[in-house]
């Protein structure tokens, strides 16, 4: 709220920048990754509170779980979209079809974030679009995801799915936001847009 980014957000940005340079090295665009030349003091550090995030492989396992109920499936798909976009659970619970607009030929989520009151404009790549459920009607006020109301119940479904996936990390729905930056390069997400919601 003071205009500064959280320590963990800065760490995720550093990891994302490092991934960009690693990709540039692999494609022989640059000779070495300049992030590796930073001293320990110059690098960002994780905050004391440990926050879990999923690797791409773990997220794939989570999303490939065969869900037993419609509520479980809805949480699974919403988690996938949050992992691609960084959208908070509170915003996902209130996301309406009218919030998804076609801008320059690209399906884009345009919302005012409930927590920060700041606007966020997030273009959706093909992977993100795959998490959207079939639209039931033409009403722009209709919810995209019919998620259960209580966050505790959503956490219950997340734990159930992750146990089925054989993932030992103790993570919650909020962990999807910590996964976003680590997926940004591999998923083709627009980093400047992701920054808006992180």
Across the structure, where does each feature detected by a protein language model lie?
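Conserved tyrosine-mediated DNA breakage-rejoining catalytic core shared by Y-recombinases
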Residues: 37-43, 58, 85, 94-134
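Short, contiguous acidic/charged loop-to-helix segments that flank catalytic cores in large enzymes
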Residues: 48-51, 67-70, 111-119, 144-149, ...
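C-terminal catalytic core of tyrosine-transesterase DNA break-rejoin enzymes
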Residues: 80, 84-91, 157-160, 164, ...
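Hydrophobic recognition helices of helix-based DNA-binding modules
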Residues: 17-25, 132-135, 184, 188
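Active-site/catalytic core of tyrosine-dependent DNA strand-transfer enzymes
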Residues: 59, 125-168
């Amino acid at each position: 709220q003071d205009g500064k980014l959280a320590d963990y957000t800065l760490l995720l940005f550093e990891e994302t920048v490092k991934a960009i340079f690693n990709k540039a090295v692999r494609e022989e665009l640059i000779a070495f990754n300049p992030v590796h030349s930073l001293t320990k003091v110059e690098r960002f550090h994780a905050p004391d509170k440990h926050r879990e995030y999923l690797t791409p492989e773990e997220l794939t396992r989570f999303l490939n779980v065969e869900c037993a109920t419609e509520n479980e499936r809805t949480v699974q798909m919403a988690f996938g979209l949050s992992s691609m976009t960084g959208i908070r659970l509170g915003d996902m619970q209130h996301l309406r079809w009218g919030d998804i607009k076609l801008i320059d030929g690209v399906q884009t989520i345009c919302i005012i974030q409930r927590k920060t009151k700041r606007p966020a404009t997030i273009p959706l790549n093909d992977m993100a679009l795959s998490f959207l459920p079939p639209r039931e009607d033409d009403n722009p006020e209709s919810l995209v995801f019919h998620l259960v109301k209580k966050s505790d119940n959503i956490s219950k479904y997340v734990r159930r799915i992750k146990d089925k996936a054989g993932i030992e990390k103790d993570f919650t729905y909020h962990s999807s936001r910590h996964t976003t930056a680590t997926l940004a390069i591999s998923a083709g997400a627009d980093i400047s847009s992701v920054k808006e919601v992180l």
